[in-house]
């Protein structure tokens, strides 16, 4: 029973009041570590033993992988445990996803059966945390993560998908021992917190892995640090035979593959294939293949990884089912396409809903590192090669601590005009800084006071 602490009792009536308060109570915006949140979680008796938990880490692709899994698992039979030999049984009643950050509304961070959490559930959770934490200082992210966990404990979904916020090893979500650990991609980002090279960053992301847990490594060229971490936690467990141990770790381009129609291994005339290999207890190779899969609007790498997760969960996969999921899955702000003539979206400066009448389509993408830049540039190149668009204008704002030069360089020769502006946050890069980075490969740059103005003039 928690004792009421008057000095930490808050009675804010609205969610916005709580969120404003949370921004003021911790000195550091990003403060990695599990010590503080673990203490408070223990006081709150955080326990997810009622659910199967999937934790997803990675530089890019986390949100899309989570969304694909969410769509796939809703209404699917849920195995009583996560053995791939387990027969499917009762229907899954609910699937919850915790992710960050949000695009328009804070409630987007936690959705249950694809519905965003309501204000009152969050307010109730915030009050409980405020009493429980006493004199322990929590960052905004730690506090809101605990709130999501309290809501999940009240709702008790059968499947919980956790998207790591930053890194993995020291991220607040890592207080939970998941049943499945997924690492999507490893690339350079958040160097001040995670390190300056893929090996160091990979180690941080691999920190979500546990022994006796299904581990899915989705990076097609995973750093050795990720593989070493997976093998280390796996070696610490006792298995009946090596085949049982091998089944726990699945690595892209070793155990599962995407095969393009141009490949000599492809057996279909168009689209692509997903191939999975494993060995039985006698060492015989077993193959499973999904043929004629649709080309994806979302990154194919994420679909490839998510399918391996589903296979490990014992979900029956068919090409028809997977194609339906590919067509269904879209994540806000990830190559999100709004068709002319009307585009409704929150203005970035004042958060009011504004209706823009457009003469052109608009693609919204929140990519902010070189890996994401390369993917988006490839998408736009594809559009141009198919003569879908004659002219592409980029409206760009970035944070000052991002690798602006290498994120924007892949767009050389693709973007016709650049509209740059500062974001409405303290960490924003100035227009001048972005111009300096862009001027090495383009002269068609226009500066604006804010993103809304830059967008209106595009």
Question: What kind of region is each of these model predictions?
Answer:
Residues 54-58:
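Hydrophobic anchor at the beta1->P-loop junction of P-loop NTPases
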Residues 159-163, 178-323:
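Acidic, Mg2+-coordinating active-site environments of NTP-dependent enzymes
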Residues 3-10, 76-93, 234-247, 252-255, ...:
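Intrinsically disordered, low-complexity terminal tails and inter-domain linkers enriched
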Residues 159-162, 172-174, 178-182, 186-190, ...:
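Nucleotide phosphate-binding/pyrophosphate-handling subdomain across enzymes
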């Amino acid at each position: 029973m928690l004792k009421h602490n008057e000095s930490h009792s808050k009675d804010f009536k609205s969610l916005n009041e709580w969120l404003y308060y949370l921004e003021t109570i911790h000195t550091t915006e990003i403060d990695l570590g599990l010590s503080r949140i673990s203490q408070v979680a223990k006081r709150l008796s955080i326990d997810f033993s009622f659910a199967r938990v999937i934790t997803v880490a990675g530089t890019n692709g986390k949100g899309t992988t989570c969304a694909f899994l969410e769509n796939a698992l809703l209404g699917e039979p849920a195995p009583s445990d996560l053995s791939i030999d387990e027969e499917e049984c009762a229907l899954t009643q609910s699937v919850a996803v915790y992710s960050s950050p949000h695009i328009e509304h804070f409630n987007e961070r936690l959705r249950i059966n694809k519905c965003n959490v309501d204000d009152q559930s969050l307010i109730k959770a915030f009050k409980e945390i405020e009493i429980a934490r006493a004199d322990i200082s929590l960052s905004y992210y730690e506090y809101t993560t605990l709130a999501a966990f309290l809501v999940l404990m009240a709702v008790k979904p059968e499947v919980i998908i956790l998207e790591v916020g930053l890194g993995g090893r020291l991220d607040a979500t890592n207080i939970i021992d998941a049943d499945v650990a997924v690492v999507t991609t490893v690339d350079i980002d958040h160097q001040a917190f995670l390190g300056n090279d893929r090996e160091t960053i990979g180690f941080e992301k691999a920190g979500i892995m546990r022994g006796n847990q299904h581990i899915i490594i989705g990076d097609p060229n995973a750093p050795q640090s990720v593989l070493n971490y997976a093998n280390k936690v796996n070696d610490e467990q006792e298995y009946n035979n090596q085949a049982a141990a091998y089944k726990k770790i699945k690595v892209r381009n070793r155990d599962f593959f995407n095969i393009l129609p141009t490949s000599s291994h492809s057996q279909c005339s168009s689209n692509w294939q997903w191939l999975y290999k494993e060995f039985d207890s006698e060492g015989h190779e077993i193959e499973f293949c999904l043929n004629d899969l649709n080309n994806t609007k979302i990154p194919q790498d994420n679909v490839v990884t998510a399918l391996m997760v589903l296979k490990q969960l014992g979900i029956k996969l068919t090409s028809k089912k997977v194609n339906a999921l590919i067509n269904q899955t879209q994540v806000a702000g990830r190559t999100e396409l709004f068709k002319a003539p009307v585009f409704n979206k929150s203005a970035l400066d004042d958060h009011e809903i504004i209706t823009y009448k457009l003469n052109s389509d608009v693609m919204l993408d929140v990519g902010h590192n070189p890996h994401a830049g390369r993917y988006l540039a490839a998408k736009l190149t594809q559009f141009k090669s198919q003569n879908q668009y004659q002219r592409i204008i980029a409206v760009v704002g970035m944070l000052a601590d991002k690798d602006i030069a290498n994120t924007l360089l892949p767009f050389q020769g693709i973007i016709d005009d650049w509209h740059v502006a500062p974001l409405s946050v303290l960490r924003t890069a100035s227009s001048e800084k972005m111009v300096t980075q862009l001027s090495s490969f383009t002269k068609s740059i226009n500066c604006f006071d804010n993103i809304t103005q830059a967008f209106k003039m595009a």
